[in-house]
Regions:
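ATP-binding Walker
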Residues: 12-13
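P-loop (Walker A) phosphate-binding loop of NTP-binding proteins
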Residues: 9
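A short, conserved alpha-helical patch in the ABC ATPase nucleotide-binding domain
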Residues: 69, 73-74
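ABC-family ATPase nucleotide-binding domain "signature/switch" substructure
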Residues: 16, 22-24, 48-57, 65-68, ...
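C-terminal boundary and immediately downstream tail of ABC-type ATPase nucleotide-binding domains
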Residues: 198-220
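Conserved coupling/switch loops of ABC nucleotide-binding domains, chiefly the family-specific signature
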Residues: 28-31, 184
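Conserved ABC transporter NBD signature motif
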Residues: 30-37, 47
């Protein structure tokens, strides 16, 4: 798992990197390769088959929850749809709805909360089962309890997939195989959590500041 990390208070280019990797935009210089092939030379359909992209702001169609999740893989059975929902931590809240998986979510998912919409989008990505998953602040609207559940599900996927995560929360990045620290749209540090702490750079400064902030809050 590789995580692009930056302070959420500033525009450091994390989401731009995610969209470039996903093939949403073309690079103006340099190159992005997938399996040794230039991304810009690959058919969009092939890129779409290889990559699942989950952003902070995911669109749901005015259809049932089941149909929205199944868009990840139209041939999926009901059991597979529900398994993906369990993995993403949304099965419990879905079953509490009057119509369960057949609940219509409303225009752009307006009948659901932001966190619920996000978990359904993650379930859709899990069902798609693409070899590359990009999570662009994908847990930002999820409450702490469900975020922990999502994190466990994401970790379970890493044994046979490439996970690229955009994040600014420390608990999200600590266990990553590689953390890339961005500042003003440039990668300035690279390594594991422990390696970056030893470097005493921007990442270590941020960790220290967060720990001090938590200590201050607890002392109030």
């Amino acid at each position: 798992m590789t995580i692009f990390f930056g302070n959420y208070l500033t525009q450091w280019g994390k989401s731009t990197v995610a969209k470039l990797i996903a093939g949403y935009w073309d690079v103006t210089s340099g190159s992005i390769t997938l399996g040794g092939h230039e991304l810009k030379d690959m058919p969009l359909s092939e890129i779409a088959d290889q990559i699942s992209y989950v952003s902070q702001d995911n669109y749901l169609f005015n259809r049932s929850i089941r149909e929205n999740i199944r868009m990840g893989r139209p041939s999926a059975t009901d059991a597979e749809v529900e398994q993906a929902a369990k993995q993403s931590g949304c099965d419990a809240f879905i079953r509490k709805l009057n119509n369960g998986y057949d609940t219509v979510v409303g225009s752009a998912g307006s009948h659901l909360s932001g966190g619920e919409r996000q978990r359904i989008a993650i379930a859709r990505a899990m069902l798609k089962d693409a070899p590359i998953i990009i999570l662009d602040e994908a847990t930002s609207s999820v409450d702490p309890e469900n975020e922990d559940e999502l994190q466990r599900a994401i970790e379970a996927l890493t044994h046979d997939k490439t996970i690229i995560m955009i994040a600014h929360q420390l608990k999200t990045v600590r266990n990553a195989d590689q953390i890339l620290v961005l500042d003003n749209a440039h990668i300035i540090q690279r390594g594991t959590h422990a390696e970056l702490i030893r470097q005493n750079g921007l990442y270590a400064d941020f960790v220290s500041a967060r720990q001090e902030a938590i200590g201050w809050k607890l002392a109030q």
